[in-house]
């Protein structure tokens, strides 16, 4: 009976426009065994994201993440100011301090769809805390370099060791925070989302991560090529004159060095200014010196055509 019901629901799911991935997740979940019709019903007619995110006690991480993916900004969808403030606080907590990287991803992505003036600052904080460490762990002194610890017995049979095996100051627990790949992915998502806020402070932050402010003021993660590429993508979407200045600097720095960064910065410059100039740093410096004017934002169709033409070159 259970197997027959699963097959029937799966077949029906293929005919529904609700998203086959969500339906498949539902019918293969433990909840489907306990309450199949209720589980499928929630996929076809999902619960209000505001209700899910406000639930007390909190819903499961999976439910909250899916609610964040469906979430629309209350202030732009007939919500109250109280709705806006509460949801923004919920997303801020999830994006900057949640123990689950999955929930952080979902919250950061949701914030990227908001137009609230507070979003840029939240996303920049989320970038800074993407390592997954708690405040206490971040403030704790670092343990000594393991390479500086001389093993028991010393380095020579004829000489007594000056230090023995375990340093008393070395922490005895494993590494804290997220894995490096997870940290990098979270930072990239933050940069792409902060670029969609179109705020001057967002452009300045992205420029710092992209490496235009010099080594002395480098942001955490700016030595990661993928993070720098995400910063350039963020600048390409951030419709501010400072973004054009930063992209021109990246193009100048990376021409003949990093092909990907140079190509991305050139694409961003053309997108923001509407000027179809070659990837010559000198010509783009002239544009900056003449005074930057941001071109009207292209429609989705125009953007698709521009991208297709650009990547065929």
Task: State each model region's role.
Residues 64, 104, 120, 187, ...:
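Residue-level detector of extended alpha-helical repeat arrays and alpha-solenoid scaffolds
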Residues 40-55, 77-96, 116-176, 199-218, ...:
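Amphipathic alpha-helical scaffolding segments comprising HEAT/armadillo-like alpha-solenoid repeats
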Residues 14-43:
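Bacterial Sec signal peptide processing site at the extreme N-terminus
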Residues 67, 107, 187-190, 231, ...:
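Conserved hydrophobic register position within alpha-solenoid helical repeats
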């Amino acid at each position: 009976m259970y197997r027959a019901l699963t097959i029937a629901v799966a077949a029906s799911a293929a005919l529904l426009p609700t998203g086959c991935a969500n339906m498949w997740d539902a019918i293969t979940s433990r909840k489907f065994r306990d309450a199949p019709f209720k589980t499928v019903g929630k996929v076809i007619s999902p619960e209000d994201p505001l209700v899910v995110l406000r639930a007390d006690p909190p819903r499961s991480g999976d439910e909250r993440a899916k609610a964040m993916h469906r979430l629309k900004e209350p202030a732009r969808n007939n919500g109250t100011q109280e709705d806006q403030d509460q949801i923004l606080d919920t997303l801020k907590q999830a994006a900057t301090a949640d123990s689950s990287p999955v929930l952080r991803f979902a919250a950061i992505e949701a914030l990227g769809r908001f137009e609230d003036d507070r979003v840029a600052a939240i996303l920049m904080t989320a970038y800074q805390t993407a390592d997954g460490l708690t405040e206490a762990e971040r403030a704790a002194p670092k343990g000594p370099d393991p390479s500086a610890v001389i093993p028991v017995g010393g380095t020579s049979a004829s000489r007594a060791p000056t230090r023995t095996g375990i340093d008393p100051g070395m922490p005895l627990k494993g590494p804290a925070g997220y894995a490096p790949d997870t940290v990098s992915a979270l930072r990239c998502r933050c940069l792409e989302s902060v670029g969609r806020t179109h705020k001057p402070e967002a452009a300045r932050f992205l420029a710092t991560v992209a490496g235009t402010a010099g080594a002395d003021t480098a942001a955490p993660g700016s030595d990661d090529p993928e993070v720098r590429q995400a910063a350039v993508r963020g600048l390409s979407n951030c419709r501010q004159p400072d973004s054009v200045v930063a992209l021109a600097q990246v193009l100048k720095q990376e021409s003949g060095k990093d092909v990907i960064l140079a190509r991305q910065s050139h694409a961003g410059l053309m997108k923001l200014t509407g000027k179809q100039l070659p990837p010559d740093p000198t010509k783009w410096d002239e544009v900056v010196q003449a005074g930057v004017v941001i071109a009207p934002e292209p429609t989705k169709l125009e953007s698709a055509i521009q991208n297709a033409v650009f990547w065929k070159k």
